[in-house]
């Protein structure tokens, strides 16, 4: 019996326009009523999906949980109480940032524990964030010292092509020892840098242990490469129909529906209800 679902948000649970369907929300509520945890497991900040938690009936609820920043932060939804903080070492973050701002095409995102800062925001990326209710502070200076006393959870760059994103990875790894980094790609626009050993999969298992749930009792659903670690870590890995080929290959179940047609409701109805 499955006791927890960990689920990516963008392009998995959410429609392409960033909204949560009524059918998905109702299925999540039905799963919760059966005692099954539904845990958003997102690369985004927890602050950006509070309204969606409200729709799910999970906002500010005790004994309900969320994972943000590709595993960087595990929270209890009640008062957004941190259970685990997996931040980047300052010098690692500083090196990643330096590579990002050297590329004038890139919008470089710095996620602290509570706030998103962007250096060189670009219109297409800003529109994408706005559609998902993501707020950010524009950096007016490239001075990274301002983050010295903060928890930097991850740094990502928005770039238009995969070739650009792979070159950015190479540029970062020319400055920062690759063994200190976990690197993924998401949303057909981002290359993402977390500290080594921190990903959606380790966080899902970590939360499971806190709740007395084994990996075999967890369902994970996703669509993109930053979801692969959680699919590989759990008992039932699921790809939505619009998932990339690598995610579909890692899945034991591929939904008939895509993210715009209630794929998560399909999963919950098939395996939980």
Identify what each model region corresponds to.
Residues 99, 105-221:
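Conserved acidic, metal-coordinating active-site core of Asp-based
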Residues 3-8, 39-40:
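Short, hydrophobic/glycine-enriched beta-strand segments
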Residues 20-125:
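Active-site phosphate-binding/coordination module
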Residues 1-4, 21, 192-273:
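Mg2+-dependent phosphoryl-transfer enzymes with acidic/Ser/Thr/Gly-rich catalytic loops
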Residues 56, 62, 70, 179, ...:
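Short, structured coil segments at secondary-structure junctions
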Residues 45, 70, 114, 189, ...:
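A generic "binding-loop/recognition-motif" signal
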